[in-house]
């Protein structure tokens, strides 16, 4: 578990299903996320799969970590309002992916920045990571702005790079080195 001023980042649990459903079923939230609008059954299935296959340690290529963001105190204490993921792409190269998604009612309040910055710090400190990468759809400038705020730089734009949810899309690649993050 990772603690920030306002959040507890922890592994997903089946008790989180109602909170997860609130944003994972929202078409605006999942527009740039690689899953469809989810039903309650799909949220349960995804949570069970994450619990069964997710890791708390990144040691081998393909290992991934998913942490939900739980509000620590106040009116929404105990509510899950988002999640971050980190996946080891290459142990040898020290490369890992990072991503985030925020509940629609809790956007633009600094939660995603707070949670993702804490996960970046945790990842660089505890795992064999030297470089974090975020792949961001070019139609999602808000996520690109967040990556920039986190200190990541845009390294590339891949034009018409993939078919995503039935449409051809371009992608930005953002990255940060461990040495840059520690400055």
Q: What kind of feature is each model-predicted range?
A:
Residues 133-135, 153-171:
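Conserved catalytic-core motifs of GNAT/GCN5-like acyltransferases
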């Amino acid at each position: 578990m990772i603690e920030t001023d306002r959040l507890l980042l922890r592994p997903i649990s089946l008790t989180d299903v109602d909170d997860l459903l609130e944003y994972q079923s929202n078409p605006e939230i999942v527009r740039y996320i690689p899953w469809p609008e989810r039903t309650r059954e799909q949220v349960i299935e995804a949570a069970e799969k994450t619990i069964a296959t997710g890791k708390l340690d990144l040691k081998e290529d393909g290992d991934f970590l998913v942490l939900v963001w739980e509000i620590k105190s106040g009116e929404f204490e105990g509510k899950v309002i988002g999640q971050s993921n980190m996946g080891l792409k290459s142990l040898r190269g020290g490369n890992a992916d990072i991503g985030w998604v925020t509940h629609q009612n809790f956007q633009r309040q600094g939660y995603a920045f707070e949670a993702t910055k804490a996960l970046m710090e945790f990842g660089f400190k505890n795992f064999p990571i030297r470089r974090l990468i975020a792949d961001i759809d070019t139609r999602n400038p808000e996520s690109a702005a967040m990556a920039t705020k986190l200190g990541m730089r845009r390294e590339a734009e891949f034009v018409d790079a993939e078919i995503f949810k039935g449409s051809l899309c371009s992608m930005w690649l953002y990255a940060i080195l461990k040495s840059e993050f520690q400055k």
